[in-house]
Design a protein with these regions (language model features):
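Predominantly extracellular/luminal regions of secreted and cell-surface proteins
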Residues: 2-32, 103
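Short connector loops at helix/strand junctions that flank enzyme active sites
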Residues: 50-54, 62, 73-75, 80, ...
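Compositionally biased, intrinsically disordered linkers/stalks adjacent to structured regions
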Residues: 182-185
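Glycine-rich active-site/cofactor-binding loop and its immediate structural neighborhood
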Residues: 62, 67-96
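Short histidine-centered beta-strand/loop micro-motifs
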Residues: 48-49, 68-70, 83, 151-154
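Acidic, metal-coordinating catalytic segment for phosphate/diphosphate chemistry
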Residues: 19-56
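Unchanged
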Residues: 86-176
């Protein structure tokens, strides 16, 4: 049974999704899929397959010219910090926690009052963990941070760096990542 904070957070996300206006066709197509997933009580559990809610942080520097990305150890990709909700239905808190854990940043300022982007992406099977291919229903928040602040690479990453937005495609040219950059223009 969900507590009142969890119910409130889930309802808040559902309301935000229903009210969300985007010019991107792929995001519009994701909205009903997110809403359908959120009807399941285990949507925030990583064990819920074929997919579950995740939260991530698109962190830009103070002048908006760079983004902080991590080189994910298991996926071998440059990505924004983020991860599993593990039952926490406050997806903003999930994104903030993951940003702190994966970058060491403790002073992040949210830009905007709601999520910045949504995405559904496939995660390959992990035979070493006996985990099948599944989808991450990623709720992305925009944050700003001081690029001079000390960074700390987590065990989940092999590298961490501020990347000029103009060079982003050299690190990750996936459509959903480039969409995040285009939203800053």
């Amino acid at each position: 049974m969900m507590d009142s904070e969890a119910t409130s957070a889930r309802e808040s996300l559902l309301t935000s999704l229903r009210d969300y206006k985007t010019i991107y066709n792929e995001e519009r197509a994701f909205i009903p899929r997110f809403i359908e997933l959120l009807e399941h009580p285990d949507a925030y559990q990583r064990t819920h397959l074929p997919g579950h809610i995740t939260g991530s942080a698109w962190i830009i520097n103070d002048d908006g010219s760079k983004v902080l990305l991590v080189k994910h150890a298991a996926l071998h990709k440059w990505l924004q910090p983020g991860g599993h909700a593990d039952g926490d239905e406050n997806v903003f808190r999930v994104a903030l926690r993951e940003a702190n854990e994966e970058t060491g940043l403790t002073h992040l300022t949210q830009v905007g009052s709601s999520f910045f982007d949504i995405d559904i992406h496939s995660i390959p099977a992990r035979k070493d963990l006996s985990f099948p291919q599944h989808d991450h229903y990623d709720v992305r928040f925009l944050f700003q941070a001081d690029e001079k602040a000390e960074l700390k690479i987590s065990d989940e990453s092999t590298d961490l760096r501020w990347i000029p937005l103009s060079d982003l495609q050299e690190f990750n040219d996936e459509k959903s990542i480039l969409r995040l950059r285009s939203k800053l223009a």
